[in-house]
Amino acid sequence: MNFKKLPKIELHCHLDGSLRVDTILDIAKKDNIHLPSYNKKELINYVSIMDDCNSLDEYLNKFFIPNKVMQTKENLKRIAFELLEDVAADNVKYIEVRFAPLLHVEKGLNIEEIIESVLEGIKEAEKLYDIKGNLILGCMRNMDIPSAFEVVKKGAKFIGKGVVAIDLCAGEEPHFPGKYIEVLKLAKECGYRITIHAGEAGVGENVLEAINLLNAERIGHGIYIKDCAEAYKLVKEKNIPLEVCPTSNLHTKAFESYETHPFMDFLKDGIKVTINTDNMTVSNTTITKELEMLNKFCGLSIGDYKILYLNAVEASFASSETKEVLKSYVKEITA
């Protein structure tokens, strides 16, 4: 089965986890940024999981170097453009890129300038390629609550101009949703759609709380609902889409193998699953690679993929017009 040729949708892709290594090197040399190595083969080890990784926290360490080169308008625009260029080459028709604006203020940019630069890169790529992109703003859970309010407030002016949603990301602690009730209440009032990283690192109850306390419309990862019957039931009853990222889940040691990943069980039970990369560079993956692995180890069929694709169309925060265009590609999903 040729997954490369199939139309695809990406709903969970972090900008700072998906840079070209060549671009990191190029910007570092141009802007005189120190890197541990200027040899591409060596640098890959610092920004990608090559052999082993023991936890989500260790996985997140791979973002330090990419963020060093994402501190100017020019660089942010370029990196956003290149991401859409890369996924368009993988036949991705629609992507929701997510990033945390406050990770890019080190050289004096303000939140509005940061968001605007990324949107410019997305829009430039849309003009050249058969792809549509939107932006999800991330609030870092390792920053204070006022920081989250700042992102929500300052990003609101871009809703309807490319920004579609708000997210909570970074390391996951039990019962984190309770801290962010007021932040997400404001986000909803501003008009943001809501997706929350939860149930990625062993705490299924966080999914329950993200839906009940934060009005999450989608869940990033959500795989640990398998250990929380109440969360599983709620996700199924409310038809809450899960943004599943299989290779990333293996890297963070959520699961030992593709065969033991619960993705196929979820799909067969009617959970609205979508398949995503999470971080193309950190996990050294593409949507095509994800599908190939699921086909090889889990028996993913063309019929299964059609369900996944339509799940992603429905789960997306795209406009109704864009969704209709995306649905039209279903006829291309053949073995």
From Swiss-Prot:
This enzyme catalyses: adenosine + H2O + H(+) = inosine + NH4(+); 2'-deoxyadenosine + H2O + H(+) = 2'-deoxyinosine + NH4(+)
| Main EC class the enzyme belongs to | hydrolase
This entry carries the following GO cellular component terms, namely: cytosol
Keywords of the record: Hydrolase, Metal-binding, Nucleotide metabolism, Zinc
Q: Which InterPro entries match?
A: A_deaminase, A_deaminase_dom, Ado/ade_deaminase, Metal_Hydrolase
Q: Where is this site: Important for catalytic activity?
A: H221
PANTHER family, sorted: ADENOSINE DEAMINASE
The record's function comment reads:
Catalyzes the hydrolytic deamination of adenosine and 2-deoxyadenosine.
Q: What is this protein called?
A: Adenosine deaminase
- Identify the species of origin: Clostridium botulinum (strain Loch Maree / Type A3)
Tell me the classification of the organism that encodes this protein: Bacteria, Bacillati, Bacillota, Clostridia, Eubacteriales
Gene name in the database record: add
